[in-house]
UniProtKB/Swiss-Prot annotation:
Gene3D superfamilies: Aldolase class I
Listed Pfam families: Trp_syntA (PF00290)
Protein name: Tryptophan synthase alpha chain
GO cellular component, one term: cytosol
Complex formation: Tetramer of two alpha and two beta chains.
Species this chain originates from: Streptococcus mutans serotype c (strain ATCC 700610 / UA159)
């Protein structure tokens, strides 16, 4: 199966719009998890394509300082993977949700139980940045025949054969990493980035979204020209935490209503 997320994104593409997926950290709110659906509703109102929800973890190897701090704020409030899933089971959302988590919390929760419990939520995609493709067998058998896509990350350092392998096996969408390193790093894009993104978009049968370092309107325009859209994390997380709703509202609107 694993169709809902891809079909939803492809329908937006068919309207000539760029895709825009914001990232939020679950529990990073004045009200903790009680504010999760408030944030989701706010983002849905701006016309986002889907919403990526981060699971806080004590050793976030792929997170930049903004998201790492957000995770720490969430953990201090007592947020856990179990409490997040329980909250997500309370209410369905208008757009698909994508969980971004490290593998350790999933392993501790129980992989089979984790996948089963997500079936009663609006989560249609999973991103596990520290789970190598060769070790996806830890979770893939539990995803068979379920509407839950394991989204691959493809970076500039991924070899051509490896790219082909990842994309042929991809579900949901392809997460194209614009900058090597942690999230939130901006600028300093490699000269061959646009060529790389165009190549991925040409060979993939599902949408390709660009993330890591996307933080300006110029980034949105640039990456919509060479891929299907963008994923924005640090700018959204920082804006929500600092109460800059109107500023990020305009930014999100520009991204979610970008006309190809």
């Amino acid at each position: 199966m694993t169709k809902t997320l891809t079909k939803h994104l492809q329908a937006i593409k068919a309207e000539g719009k760029g895709l825009f997926i914001p990232y939020i950290m679950a529990g990073d709110h004045d009200k903790g998890l009680d504010g999760l659906f408030d944030t989701i509703s706010f983002l849905e109102a701006q016309g986002v394509s889907a919403i990526e929800i981060g699971i806080p973890w004590s050793d976030p190897v792929a997170d930049g300082p903004v998201i790492e701090l957000a995770g720490q704020r969430s953990l201090v409030k007592g947020t856990s993977l179990a409490s997040i899933i329980a909250r997500l089971q309370e209410k369905k959302t208008q757009v698909p949700l994508v969980i971004m988590t490290y593998f350790n919390p999933v392993f501790q929760y129980g992989v089979e139980t984790f996948v089963a419990d997500l079936q009663n939520t609006s989560v249609k995609g999973l991103i596990i940045p520290d789970l190598p493709h060769e070790q996806e067998s830890f979770i893939k058998p539990y995803l068979e025949n379920l509407d839950l896509a394991l989204v691959p990350l493809v970076s500039l350092t991924t070899g051509l054969e490896r790219q082909k392998e990842l994309i042929e096996d991809a579900r949901g969408f392809v997460y194209a990493v614009a900058i090597n390193g942690v999230t939130g790093k901006t600028g300093n894009y490699r000269d061959d980035l646009d060529k790389h993104l165009k190549h991925l978009t040409e060979i993939a049968q599902i949408p390709v979204l660009t993330g890591f370092g996307v933080s300006t309107l110029a980034d949105i325009k640039r990456f919509n020209q060479v891929s299907d859209g963008v994923i924005v994390g640090s700018k959204i997380v920082k804006g929500l935490h600092e109460g800059m709703q109107e500023e990020i509202k305009d930014f999100i609107y520009a991204g979610s209503h970008y006309q190809k």
